[in-house]
């Protein structure tokens, strides 16, 4: 959610900080600010709105200085306003940026008021700022003051602190909110995502839970939750420098839709041999972890949850294991039964989704045999803390509405189905069919992208609609759910998805000429039942848009528009039918003039509960 960038250098850093914020805009925000130390003084500029507003203000009134911090804020405590925007100051000495929620901020605020501190904002973050200032009265360094401060905090935080009286130092702390250190030559950096720092460094170390780090131009010292000095592995980023550029595309979302064939090629590459998915696709020790699995518990949020829902059908139908899929925030707050030989699977593009992380930690305490994450972010918390990791290799995804991450997640889950299935007696023929399907996916997705022009024309029908209904059966039901989510996310049209067999149990009451019904209809064993559902909608005057296999024998008429989808096998069908639904949501949003890449009120990476 909130974006953080910090720098300690000999050169002026304001431009580096603002560029870092631009590269974090995908996280969602409502205001932005920067504070820089120059000649022993803290200078700060904040603006409500886009980073461009902050950039324009700095062009008019530049900030000089080699040590600074910057932030994009997602409002949690206090409305979006300049006085609530970060960085926050204490007595003109301390500046702080923060991502997370301090749950005991009311109690701390009252204590600080008793010590004479005055609050200028409604945020929980200002508590951190004044606490550090207060701790400096009894601690001899900024590091010691921050270490004492975080011991008083309850909740989640990723925070960076600077002091005008100690102008070549940042102190960084994390608990429940990610931070990464970037290493330069005679300069060092910090950010909430390595993407922010790629223009200035490619060497990174990820802080772990409870870490506090002291960062100067030439040194980085990291201390664990107990105050012991520790080393964190420094890795070279695999993300390309231009990952944050749109290139020839109008929006990141469209770019990422069209990157799906390449993303799938990368995720499959090196993971199939002799007509089998290799156990090592999930880690060096995966064979041992996966060989006796009889139950799979999948935990995820949003789009990732839909990927897990599709995988449930595969794992139960083809791999011969029971499977449960649950929203992470729900899993945490109910007493679930642990089955013997259970595998916990988390799915997260960022690897830092707060609810998913917390659910995974709870599951480990419960005694799951093994944990696996399907993730796109090397070095993220889920990757570090799980027994196994399937690295998606989808490349940076900037658009808030997930596209290529979803299809790559589906591919990874199909691979997991093949591996668990092999350990449970799946035939060699089925394994070969799955691997053949995986290897054919990139080309088949390329074919599906050929529907773009037809779908752009179709989108005109949705421009004046306020509601839409998506229908699917079997493993296409989660795809209908994903299609509905995409439409509501970026076009702001209220959309719902139902298993088509549920039509009689409520949704039919909504059907009329103003409620478009979108149906996904691959040529599978459920097709004839789906056709019956279509007739139920037709009989009630509904206008339908059917994405159907070219061999499915649907014909367009006055009440039904049929969009032929390239023929595909049962293994890849959910993935292929996702593509036209992504394109539909994109083109409807384009016509409506909404913010495609940064839809209102949404964030890419949800790092607070």
UniProtKB/Swiss-Prot annotation:
InterPro entries in the record: GATase_2_dom (IPR017932), GFAT (IPR005855), GFAT_N (IPR047084), GlmS/AgaS_SIS (IPR035466), GlmS/FrlB_SIS (IPR035490), Ntn_hydrolases_N (IPR029055), SIS_dom (IPR001347), SIS_dom_sf (IPR046348)
Active site: 2 (nucleophile), 604 (for fru-6p isomerization activity)
MF terms in GO: carbohydrate derivative binding; glutamine-fructose-6-phosphate transaminase (isomerizing) activity
Name of one Pfam family that matches: GATase_6
UniProt catalytic activity: D-fructose 6-phosphate + L-glutamine = D-glucosamine 6-phosphate + L-glutamate
Record's keyword annotation contains Nucleotidyltransferase: no
Domain SIS per the UniProt entry, residue ranges: 286-426, 458-599
GO BP term (any one): UDP-N-acetylglucosamine metabolic process
Domain of life: Bacteria
EC number(s) reported in the record: 2.6.1.16
Cell location: Cytoplasm
Name under which the protein is recorded: Glutamine--fructose-6-phosphate aminotransferase [isomerizing]
